[in-house]
Amino acid sequence: MKAGTGPLLSTLLGLLFLSIQGTGGVNPGVVARITDKGLAYAAKEGLVALQRELYKITLPDFSGDFKIKAVGRGQYEFHSLEIQNCELRGSSLKLLPGQGLSLAISDSSIGVRGKWKVRKSFLKLHGSFDLDVKGVTISVDLLLGMDPSGRPTVSASGCSSRICDLDVHISGNVGWLLNLFHNQIESKLQKVLENKVCEMIQKSVTSDLQPYLQTLPVTAEIDNVLGIDYSLVAAPQAKAQVLDVMFKGEIFNRNHRSPVATPTPTMSLPEDSKQMVYFAISDYAFNIASRVYHQAGYLNFSITDDMLPHDSGIRLNTKAFRPFTPQIYKKYPDMKLELLGTVVSAPILNVSPGNLSLAPQMEIEGFVILPTSAREPVFRLGVVTNVFASLTFNNSKVTGMLHPDKAQVRLIESKVGMFNVNLFQAFLNYYLLNSLYPDVNAELAQGFPLPLPRHIQLHDLDFQIRKDFLYLGANVQYMRV
Protein backbone atom coordinates (compact mmCIF):
# COMPACT_ATOMS: atom_id res chain seq x y z
CA MET A 1 0.00 0.00 0.00
CA LYS A 2 1.23 3.48 -0.75
CA ALA A 3 1.87 5.81 2.15
CA GLY A 4 -1.42 7.64 2.42
CA THR A 5 -4.39 8.14 4.66
CA GLY A 6 -4.60 4.37 5.15
CA PRO A 7 -3.64 4.61 8.84
CA LEU A 8 -6.31 7.24 9.45
CA LEU A 9 -9.34 4.98 9.48
CA SER A 10 -7.84 1.62 8.76
CA THR A 11 -5.93 1.79 12.00
CA LEU A 12 -9.25 1.19 13.68
CA LEU A 13 -11.92 0.87 11.08
CA GLY A 14 -10.13 -2.02 9.49
CA LEU A 15 -9.60 -3.42 12.92
CA LEU A 16 -12.74 -5.48 13.11
CA PHE A 17 -15.31 -3.26 14.49
CA LEU A 18 -18.20 -5.43 15.36
CA SER A 19 -21.42 -4.65 17.13
CA ILE A 20 -23.62 -5.94 19.83
CA GLN A 21 -26.46 -7.09 17.65
CA GLY A 22 -26.80 -7.46 13.94
CA THR A 23 -29.64 -6.46 11.68
CA GLY A 24 -32.45 -8.57 10.38
CA GLY A 25 -32.20 -10.93 13.36
CA VAL A 26 -28.62 -11.95 12.52
CA ASN A 27 -26.19 -11.59 15.41
CA PRO A 28 -22.40 -11.50 15.05
CA GLY A 29 -20.26 -14.32 16.43
CA VAL A 30 -17.34 -12.00 17.11
CA VAL A 31 -17.66 -8.47 18.47
CA ALA A 32 -15.35 -5.48 18.79
CA ARG A 33 -16.07 -1.91 19.71
CA ILE A 34 -14.01 1.26 19.24
CA THR A 35 -13.85 3.90 21.94
CA ASP A 36 -13.09 7.63 21.82
CA LYS A 37 -9.52 6.75 22.76
CA GLY A 38 -9.29 4.63 19.65
CA LEU A 39 -10.70 7.37 17.45
CA ALA A 40 -8.21 9.84 18.94
CA TYR A 41 -5.36 7.51 17.99
CA ALA A 42 -6.72 7.18 14.48
CA ALA A 43 -6.90 10.97 14.16
CA LYS A 44 -3.29 11.26 15.33
CA GLU A 45 -2.13 8.70 12.77
CA GLY A 46 -4.23 10.48 10.17
CA LEU A 47 -2.31 13.72 10.65
CA VAL A 48 0.95 11.94 9.86
CA ALA A 49 -0.54 10.42 6.73
CA LEU A 50 -2.15 13.63 5.51
CA GLN A 51 1.06 15.62 5.94
CA ARG A 52 2.84 13.16 3.66
CA GLU A 53 0.12 13.51 1.08
CA LEU A 54 0.09 17.31 1.18
CA TYR A 55 3.66 17.42 -0.12
CA LYS A 56 2.46 15.62 -3.25
CA ILE A 57 0.00 18.35 -4.24
CA THR A 58 0.95 20.01 -7.54
CA LEU A 59 0.09 23.68 -7.95
CA PRO A 60 -0.48 25.41 -11.30
CA ASP A 61 1.40 28.38 -12.72
CA PHE A 62 -0.27 31.79 -12.71
CA SER A 63 0.41 34.20 -15.58
CA GLY A 64 -1.17 37.18 -17.27
CA ASP A 65 -0.84 40.77 -18.39
CA PHE A 66 -0.56 43.76 -16.15
CA LYS A 67 -0.93 47.50 -16.56
CA ILE A 68 0.46 49.58 -13.76
CA LYS A 69 0.58 53.37 -13.97
CA ALA A 70 4.10 53.73 -12.66
CA VAL A 71 5.43 50.71 -14.57
CA GLY A 72 3.38 50.41 -17.72
CA ARG A 73 2.28 47.25 -19.50
CA GLY A 74 3.91 43.83 -19.28
CA GLN A 75 3.50 40.15 -18.56
CA TYR A 76 3.96 38.32 -15.26
CA GLU A 77 4.30 34.67 -14.28
CA PHE A 78 4.37 32.96 -10.89
CA HIS A 79 5.60 29.43 -11.53
CA SER A 80 7.30 26.32 -10.07
CA LEU A 81 5.14 26.42 -6.95
CA GLU A 82 6.01 23.65 -4.47
CA ILE A 83 4.86 22.88 -0.95
CA GLN A 84 7.95 23.09 1.25
CA ASN A 85 6.48 22.43 4.66
CA CYS A 86 3.19 21.80 6.35
CA GLU A 87 2.12 21.52 9.94
CA LEU A 88 -1.22 19.97 10.83
CA ARG A 89 -1.81 20.64 14.51
CA GLY A 90 -5.32 20.03 15.73
CA SER A 91 -7.40 17.06 14.59
CA SER A 92 -10.43 15.14 15.76
CA LEU A 93 -12.28 12.10 14.50
CA LYS A 94 -15.88 12.14 15.68
CA LEU A 95 -18.76 9.78 15.26
CA LEU A 96 -21.40 10.70 12.71
CA PRO A 97 -24.38 8.65 13.95
CA GLY A 98 -25.99 6.57 11.24
CA GLN A 99 -23.36 7.47 8.64
CA GLY A 100 -19.76 7.04 9.73
CA LEU A 101 -17.10 9.43 10.94
CA SER A 102 -16.31 13.12 10.66
CA LEU A 103 -12.70 14.25 10.43
CA ALA A 104 -11.81 17.84 11.36
CA ILE A 105 -8.38 19.50 11.20
CA SER A 106 -7.77 23.06 12.39
CA ASP A 107 -5.05 25.61 13.23
CA SER A 108 -2.74 24.33 10.52
CA SER A 109 -0.28 25.95 8.12
CA ILE A 110 1.37 25.27 4.76
CA GLY A 111 4.53 26.78 3.34
CA VAL A 112 4.83 27.28 -0.45
CA ARG A 113 7.91 28.36 -2.41
CA GLY A 114 7.93 29.45 -6.06
CA LYS A 115 9.51 31.66 -8.68
CA TRP A 116 8.36 34.82 -10.43
CA LYS A 117 9.34 36.58 -13.62
CA VAL A 118 8.22 39.77 -15.30
CA ARG A 119 8.68 40.87 -18.92
CA LYS A 120 8.26 44.47 -20.07
CA SER A 121 9.46 45.27 -23.57
CA PHE A 122 13.08 44.14 -23.53
CA LEU A 123 13.32 44.18 -19.74
CA LYS A 124 13.18 40.87 -17.88
CA LEU A 125 13.08 40.49 -14.11
CA HIS A 126 12.91 37.31 -12.06
CA GLY A 127 13.18 36.08 -8.51
CA SER A 128 11.61 33.83 -5.92
CA PHE A 129 8.81 34.10 -3.42
CA ASP A 130 7.64 32.36 -0.25
CA LEU A 131 4.04 31.99 0.75
CA ASP A 132 2.84 31.26 4.28
CA VAL A 133 -0.64 29.76 4.26
CA LYS A 134 -2.15 30.21 7.72
CA GLY A 135 -5.28 29.14 9.53
CA VAL A 136 -5.94 26.07 7.39
CA THR A 137 -9.05 24.09 8.40
CA ILE A 138 -10.23 20.86 6.81
CA SER A 139 -13.39 18.86 7.41
CA VAL A 140 -14.64 15.74 5.65
CA ASP A 141 -17.22 13.04 6.34
CA LEU A 142 -16.17 9.40 5.95
CA LEU A 143 -19.25 7.35 5.05
CA LEU A 144 -19.08 3.67 5.96
CA GLY A 145 -20.81 0.86 4.11
CA MET A 146 -20.49 -2.76 3.04
CA ASP A 147 -19.76 -4.34 -0.33
CA PRO A 148 -21.37 -7.57 -1.66
CA SER A 149 -18.42 -9.66 -0.43
CA GLY A 150 -19.04 -8.54 3.15
CA ARG A 151 -16.07 -6.19 3.46
CA PRO A 152 -16.36 -2.63 4.82
CA THR A 153 -16.34 0.30 2.41
CA VAL A 154 -15.54 3.97 2.94
CA SER A 155 -16.14 7.06 0.82
CA ALA A 156 -15.40 10.75 1.36
CA SER A 157 -18.29 13.22 1.36
CA GLY A 158 -18.77 16.92 2.01
CA CYS A 159 -15.10 17.88 2.05
CA SER A 160 -14.45 21.48 2.99
CA SER A 161 -11.10 23.26 3.15
CA ARG A 162 -10.69 26.87 4.27
CA ILE A 163 -7.66 29.19 4.43
CA CYS A 164 -7.73 32.13 6.80
CA ASP A 165 -4.72 34.12 5.58
CA LEU A 166 -1.87 34.15 3.04
CA ASP A 167 1.38 36.00 3.74
CA VAL A 168 3.72 36.41 0.74
CA HIS A 169 7.40 37.41 0.70
CA ILE A 170 8.78 38.38 -2.73
CA SER A 171 12.48 38.81 -3.44
CA GLY A 172 13.74 41.87 -5.27
CA ASN A 173 11.99 44.58 -3.26
CA VAL A 174 9.38 45.18 -5.96
CA GLY A 175 6.39 46.54 -4.11
CA TRP A 176 4.23 46.85 -7.20
CA LEU A 177 4.65 43.10 -7.83
CA LEU A 178 3.50 42.39 -4.29
CA ASN A 179 0.41 44.48 -4.89
CA LEU A 180 -0.17 42.66 -8.17
CA PHE A 181 -0.01 39.32 -6.34
CA HIS A 182 -2.56 40.46 -3.76
CA ASN A 183 -4.88 41.87 -6.41
CA GLN A 184 -4.75 39.16 -9.09
CA ILE A 185 -3.18 35.96 -7.68
CA GLU A 186 -3.96 35.62 -4.00
CA SER A 187 -7.65 34.73 -4.18
CA LYS A 188 -7.06 32.37 -7.13
CA LEU A 189 -4.23 30.55 -5.35
CA GLN A 190 -6.26 30.31 -2.16
CA LYS A 191 -9.14 28.70 -4.04
CA VAL A 192 -6.77 26.33 -5.86
CA LEU A 193 -5.17 25.24 -2.58
CA GLU A 194 -8.54 24.67 -0.93
CA ASN A 195 -9.71 22.57 -3.88
CA LYS A 196 -6.43 20.65 -4.11
CA VAL A 197 -6.58 19.67 -0.45
CA CYS A 198 -10.06 18.18 -0.89
CA GLU A 199 -9.01 16.46 -4.12
CA MET A 200 -6.08 14.93 -2.27
CA ILE A 201 -8.32 13.64 0.51
CA GLN A 202 -10.84 12.21 -1.96
CA LYS A 203 -8.06 10.48 -3.90
CA SER A 204 -6.43 9.09 -0.77
CA VAL A 205 -9.71 7.64 0.50
CA THR A 206 -10.42 6.05 -2.89
CA SER A 207 -6.89 4.91 -3.77
CA ASP A 208 -5.39 4.12 -0.36
CA LEU A 209 -7.95 3.68 2.39
CA GLN A 210 -10.62 1.75 0.51
CA PRO A 211 -8.13 -0.77 -0.97
CA TYR A 212 -6.59 -1.13 2.48
CA LEU A 213 -9.95 -2.08 3.95
CA GLN A 214 -10.18 -4.74 1.28
CA THR A 215 -7.25 -6.50 2.99
CA LEU A 216 -9.59 -7.32 5.86
CA PRO A 217 -10.11 -11.08 5.47
CA VAL A 218 -13.59 -12.36 4.64
CA THR A 219 -12.54 -15.92 5.41
CA ALA A 220 -9.51 -17.25 7.23
CA GLU A 221 -8.08 -20.74 7.64
CA ILE A 222 -7.84 -22.12 11.15
CA ASP A 223 -6.48 -25.56 10.24
CA ASN A 224 -6.95 -28.19 7.55
CA VAL A 225 -10.55 -28.78 8.69
CA LEU A 226 -11.88 -25.42 9.89
CA GLY A 227 -12.29 -22.01 8.35
CA ILE A 228 -13.95 -18.91 9.78
CA ASP A 229 -16.26 -16.47 7.98
CA TYR A 230 -15.45 -12.87 8.84
CA SER A 231 -17.83 -11.22 6.39
CA LEU A 232 -19.90 -8.34 7.72
CA VAL A 233 -23.42 -8.97 8.91
CA ALA A 234 -24.32 -5.33 8.20
CA ALA A 235 -22.64 -2.06 7.33
CA PRO A 236 -20.54 -0.50 10.11
CA GLN A 237 -22.73 1.49 12.47
CA ALA A 238 -21.71 4.78 14.06
CA LYS A 239 -23.63 5.41 17.25
CA ALA A 240 -23.54 8.22 19.78
CA GLN A 241 -20.56 6.88 21.73
CA VAL A 242 -19.06 3.97 19.77
CA LEU A 243 -18.36 2.66 16.31
CA ASP A 244 -19.71 -0.87 15.78
CA VAL A 245 -19.23 -3.23 12.87
CA MET A 246 -20.73 -6.72 12.64
CA PHE A 247 -18.98 -9.88 11.50
CA LYS A 248 -20.47 -13.35 11.26
CA GLY A 249 -17.61 -15.07 13.06
CA GLU A 250 -19.02 -18.33 11.71
CA ILE A 251 -16.91 -21.50 11.79
CA PHE A 252 -17.31 -23.88 8.85
CA ASN A 253 -15.89 -27.08 7.40
CA ARG A 254 -13.49 -26.06 4.65
CA ASN A 255 -14.20 -29.22 2.67
CA HIS A 256 -17.98 -29.23 2.98
CA ARG A 257 -19.68 -26.03 4.07
CA SER A 258 -23.27 -26.33 5.20
CA PRO A 259 -25.69 -23.80 6.75
CA VAL A 260 -25.52 -23.40 10.52
CA ALA A 261 -28.83 -24.37 12.05
CA THR A 262 -28.29 -22.73 15.44
CA PRO A 263 -28.69 -18.92 15.51
CA THR A 264 -25.94 -16.88 17.08
CA PRO A 265 -26.90 -15.67 20.57
CA THR A 266 -26.89 -11.98 21.45
CA MET A 267 -23.98 -10.56 23.44
CA SER A 268 -24.18 -7.55 25.74
CA LEU A 269 -20.89 -5.70 26.03
CA PRO A 270 -20.03 -3.71 29.15
CA GLU A 271 -19.51 0.03 28.84
CA ASP A 272 -15.71 0.20 28.92
CA SER A 273 -13.57 2.99 27.51
CA LYS A 274 -10.07 2.63 28.96
CA GLN A 275 -8.65 1.02 25.84
CA MET A 276 -8.94 1.72 22.13
CA VAL A 277 -10.95 -1.32 21.13
CA TYR A 278 -12.85 -4.12 22.84
CA PHE A 279 -13.50 -7.54 21.34
CA ALA A 280 -15.97 -10.22 22.31
CA ILE A 281 -15.98 -13.76 20.93
CA SER A 282 -19.17 -15.71 21.52
CA ASP A 283 -19.00 -19.25 22.87
CA TYR A 284 -21.10 -19.93 19.77
CA ALA A 285 -17.96 -19.74 17.61
CA PHE A 286 -16.14 -22.34 19.69
CA ASN A 287 -19.14 -24.63 19.95
CA ILE A 288 -19.74 -24.54 16.20
CA ALA A 289 -16.07 -25.48 15.80
CA SER A 290 -16.63 -28.39 18.17
CA ARG A 291 -19.67 -29.48 16.16
CA VAL A 292 -17.80 -29.32 12.85
CA TYR A 293 -14.90 -31.31 14.29
CA HIS A 294 -17.34 -33.89 15.64
CA GLN A 295 -19.24 -34.22 12.37
CA ALA A 296 -15.96 -34.61 10.49
CA GLY A 297 -14.83 -37.34 12.89
CA TYR A 298 -11.89 -35.19 13.86
CA LEU A 299 -12.47 -35.75 17.59
CA ASN A 300 -12.28 -39.54 17.28
CA PHE A 301 -9.00 -41.31 17.89
CA SER A 302 -7.49 -44.76 17.76
CA ILE A 303 -4.70 -46.29 19.84
CA THR A 304 -2.53 -49.06 18.45
CA ASP A 305 0.52 -50.70 19.96
CA ASP A 306 2.97 -48.79 17.78
CA MET A 307 1.59 -45.53 19.20
CA LEU A 308 2.64 -46.41 22.76
CA PRO A 309 6.06 -45.39 24.09
CA HIS A 310 8.70 -48.10 23.68
CA ASP A 311 9.25 -48.20 27.44
CA SER A 312 5.54 -48.56 28.23
CA GLY A 313 4.80 -51.37 30.66
CA ILE A 314 1.55 -52.06 28.82
CA ARG A 315 1.34 -53.26 25.22
CA LEU A 316 -1.75 -53.55 23.04
CA ASN A 317 -1.84 -57.29 22.50
CA THR A 318 -3.94 -59.98 24.10
CA LYS A 319 -1.06 -61.39 26.16
CA ALA A 320 -0.18 -58.05 27.76
CA PHE A 321 -3.86 -57.28 28.26
CA ARG A 322 -4.46 -60.23 30.60
CA PRO A 323 -4.34 -58.02 33.74
CA PHE A 324 -7.33 -56.11 32.35
CA THR A 325 -9.37 -59.14 31.27
CA PRO A 326 -7.86 -62.60 31.86
CA GLN A 327 -10.13 -64.37 29.39
CA ILE A 328 -9.03 -62.35 26.36
CA TYR A 329 -5.75 -64.26 25.88
CA LYS A 330 -7.46 -67.63 26.16
CA LYS A 331 -10.02 -66.69 23.52
CA TYR A 332 -7.65 -64.74 21.25
CA PRO A 333 -4.06 -65.92 21.85
CA ASP A 334 -1.19 -63.74 20.64
CA MET A 335 -3.26 -61.22 18.72
CA LYS A 336 -2.96 -57.46 18.52
CA LEU A 337 -5.49 -55.03 19.96
CA GLU A 338 -6.77 -51.67 18.78
CA LEU A 339 -8.70 -49.14 20.85
CA LEU A 340 -11.10 -46.82 19.05
CA GLY A 341 -12.25 -43.70 20.91
CA THR A 342 -15.42 -41.93 19.79
CA VAL A 343 -16.80 -38.69 21.20
CA VAL A 344 -20.51 -39.33 21.76
CA SER A 345 -21.58 -35.75 21.01
CA ALA A 346 -19.85 -32.47 20.24
CA PRO A 347 -18.44 -31.10 23.51
CA ILE A 348 -20.01 -27.83 24.62
CA LEU A 349 -17.69 -25.10 25.87
CA ASN A 350 -19.11 -23.66 29.07
CA VAL A 351 -18.20 -19.99 29.37
CA SER A 352 -18.87 -18.42 32.75
CA PRO A 353 -17.11 -15.60 34.61
CA GLY A 354 -13.50 -16.64 35.13
CA ASN A 355 -14.03 -20.16 33.84
CA LEU A 356 -13.78 -22.10 30.58
CA SER A 357 -14.62 -25.78 30.72
CA LEU A 358 -16.08 -28.68 28.79
CA ALA A 359 -17.10 -32.20 29.72
CA PRO A 360 -16.61 -34.51 26.73
CA GLN A 361 -18.28 -37.92 26.85
CA MET A 362 -16.56 -40.71 24.98
CA GLU A 363 -16.86 -44.37 24.27
CA ILE A 364 -13.82 -46.56 23.81
CA GLU A 365 -14.27 -49.82 21.99
CA GLY A 366 -11.63 -52.54 22.05
CA PHE A 367 -11.02 -54.68 18.97
CA VAL A 368 -8.97 -57.81 18.45
CA ILE A 369 -7.13 -57.91 15.13
CA LEU A 370 -7.79 -61.39 13.75
CA PRO A 371 -5.31 -63.28 11.54
CA THR A 372 -7.48 -62.30 8.57
CA SER A 373 -6.90 -58.61 9.54
CA ALA A 374 -10.59 -58.32 10.38
CA ARG A 375 -11.45 -56.49 13.60
CA GLU A 376 -13.65 -58.16 16.21
CA PRO A 377 -15.15 -56.05 19.03
CA VAL A 378 -14.52 -57.45 22.50
CA PHE A 379 -15.39 -54.70 24.98
CA ARG A 380 -16.90 -51.21 25.15
CA LEU A 381 -16.30 -48.57 27.80
CA GLY A 382 -17.84 -45.21 28.66
CA VAL A 383 -15.52 -42.34 29.55
CA VAL A 384 -16.33 -38.95 31.07
CA THR A 385 -13.92 -36.21 32.05
CA ASN A 386 -13.86 -32.53 32.87
CA VAL A 387 -11.46 -30.40 30.89
CA PHE A 388 -10.53 -26.83 31.73
CA ALA A 389 -9.29 -24.53 29.01
CA SER A 390 -6.97 -21.55 29.07
CA LEU A 391 -6.72 -19.02 26.26
CA THR A 392 -3.95 -16.64 25.33
CA PHE A 393 -4.25 -13.62 23.04
CA ASN A 394 -1.27 -12.29 21.12
CA ASN A 395 -1.29 -9.46 18.61
CA SER A 396 -3.06 -11.46 15.91
CA LYS A 397 -4.38 -14.79 17.23
CA VAL A 398 -6.21 -16.54 20.03
CA THR A 399 -4.39 -19.68 21.17
CA GLY A 400 -5.58 -22.29 23.63
CA MET A 401 -4.54 -25.12 25.91
CA LEU A 402 -6.53 -27.90 27.57
CA HIS A 403 -5.99 -28.95 31.20
CA PRO A 404 -7.88 -32.23 31.79
CA ASP A 405 -9.00 -33.78 35.05
CA LYS A 406 -8.68 -37.54 35.38
CA ALA A 407 -11.02 -39.50 33.15
CA GLN A 408 -13.64 -41.70 34.79
CA VAL A 409 -14.30 -45.06 33.10
CA ARG A 410 -17.29 -47.41 33.30
CA LEU A 411 -17.87 -50.75 31.63
CA ILE A 412 -20.68 -50.81 29.07
CA GLU A 413 -20.14 -54.25 27.57
CA SER A 414 -17.55 -57.06 27.70
CA LYS A 415 -17.50 -60.14 25.45
CA VAL A 416 -14.47 -61.55 27.25
CA GLY A 417 -15.81 -61.78 30.80
CA MET A 418 -14.45 -59.86 33.79
CA PHE A 419 -12.87 -56.48 33.03
CA ASN A 420 -10.66 -54.49 35.46
CA VAL A 421 -12.07 -51.00 34.96
CA ASN A 422 -9.80 -49.29 37.53
CA LEU A 423 -6.62 -50.60 35.92
CA PHE A 424 -7.78 -49.57 32.46
CA GLN A 425 -8.69 -46.14 33.83
CA ALA A 426 -5.11 -45.67 35.05
CA PHE A 427 -3.74 -46.76 31.65
CA LEU A 428 -6.12 -44.46 29.77
CA ASN A 429 -5.26 -41.43 31.91
CA TYR A 430 -1.56 -42.04 31.35
CA TYR A 431 -2.11 -42.16 27.58
CA LEU A 432 -4.40 -39.12 27.49
CA LEU A 433 -2.06 -36.96 29.57
CA ASN A 434 1.14 -37.99 27.83
CA SER A 435 0.05 -38.51 24.22
CA LEU A 436 -3.43 -37.38 23.20
CA TYR A 437 -3.77 -34.04 24.99
CA PRO A 438 -0.24 -32.88 24.07
CA ASP A 439 -1.14 -33.48 20.42
CA VAL A 440 -4.41 -31.57 20.82
CA ASN A 441 -2.63 -28.69 22.56
CA ALA A 442 -0.10 -28.54 19.76
CA GLU A 443 -3.01 -28.01 17.36
CA LEU A 444 -4.61 -25.38 19.60
CA ALA A 445 -1.29 -23.54 19.74
CA GLN A 446 -1.66 -22.83 16.01
CA GLY A 447 -4.29 -20.30 16.98
CA PHE A 448 -7.63 -18.83 16.02
CA PRO A 449 -6.90 -15.87 13.70
CA LEU A 450 -8.35 -12.45 14.43
CA PRO A 451 -9.66 -10.56 11.39
CA LEU A 452 -6.94 -7.91 11.23
CA PRO A 453 -5.93 -5.97 8.14
CA ARG A 454 -2.27 -5.55 7.28
CA HIS A 455 0.18 -3.70 9.53
CA ILE A 456 -2.06 -3.72 12.61
CA GLN A 457 -0.84 -4.99 15.98
CA LEU A 458 -2.57 -5.19 19.34
CA HIS A 459 -0.91 -4.56 22.70
CA ASP A 460 -1.80 -3.91 26.36
CA LEU A 461 -4.19 -6.85 26.20
CA ASP A 462 -6.74 -7.35 28.97
CA PHE A 463 -8.55 -10.70 28.75
CA GLN A 464 -11.70 -11.54 30.69
CA ILE A 465 -14.10 -14.48 30.65
CA ARG A 466 -17.70 -13.26 30.75
CA LYS A 467 -20.95 -15.16 30.65
CA ASP A 468 -21.26 -16.78 27.21
CA PHE A 469 -18.42 -14.81 25.61
CA LEU A 470 -14.73 -13.98 25.85
CA TYR A 471 -13.87 -10.31 26.27
CA LEU A 472 -10.65 -8.64 25.23
CA GLY A 473 -9.59 -5.03 25.58
CA ALA A 474 -6.61 -3.82 23.57
CA ASN A 475 -4.74 -0.82 22.35
CA VAL A 476 -3.75 -0.57 18.71
CA GLN A 477 -0.55 0.21 16.86
CA TYR A 478 -0.30 0.83 13.15
CA MET A 479 3.08 -0.43 11.90
CA ARG A 480 4.22 2.05 9.28
CA VAL A 481 5.95 0.62 6.21
Swiss-Prot record:
Positions glycosylated per UniProt: N300, N355
Xref: SMART domains: BPI1 (SM00328), BPI2 (SM00329)
InterPro entries listed in its UniProt record: Bactericidal_perm-incr_a/b_dom, BPI/LBP, BPI/LBP/Plunc, Lipid-bd_serum_glycop_C, Lipid-bd_serum_glycop_CS, Lipid-bd_serum_glycop_N
GO molecular function, one term: signaling receptor binding
Keywords, sorted A to Z: Antibiotic, Antimicrobial, Disulfide bond, Glycoprotein, Immunity, Innate immunity, Lipid transport, Membrane, Secreted, Signal, Transport
Listed Gene3D superfamilies: Bactericidal permeability-increasing protein, domain 1, Bactericidal permeability-increasing protein, domain 2
Signal sequence coordinates: 1-24
Protein name stated in the entry: Lipopolysaccharide-binding protein
Primary role: Plays a role in the innate immune response. Binds to the lipid A moiety of bacterial lipopolysaccharides (LPS), a glycolipid present in the outer membrane of all Gram-negative bacteria. Acts as an affinity enhancer for CD14, facilitating its association with LPS. Promotes the release of cytokines in response to bacterial lipopolysaccharide.
Annotated disulfide bonds: C159-C198
GO biological process assignments: acute-phase response; cell surface pattern recognition receptor signaling pathway; cellular response to lipopolysaccharide; cellular response to lipoteichoic acid; defense response to Gram-negative bacterium; defense response to Gram-positive bacterium; detection of molecule of bacterial origin; innate immune response
Quaternary context: When bound to LPS, interacts (via C-terminus) with soluble and membrane-bound CD14.
GO cellular component: cell surface; extracellular space; membrane
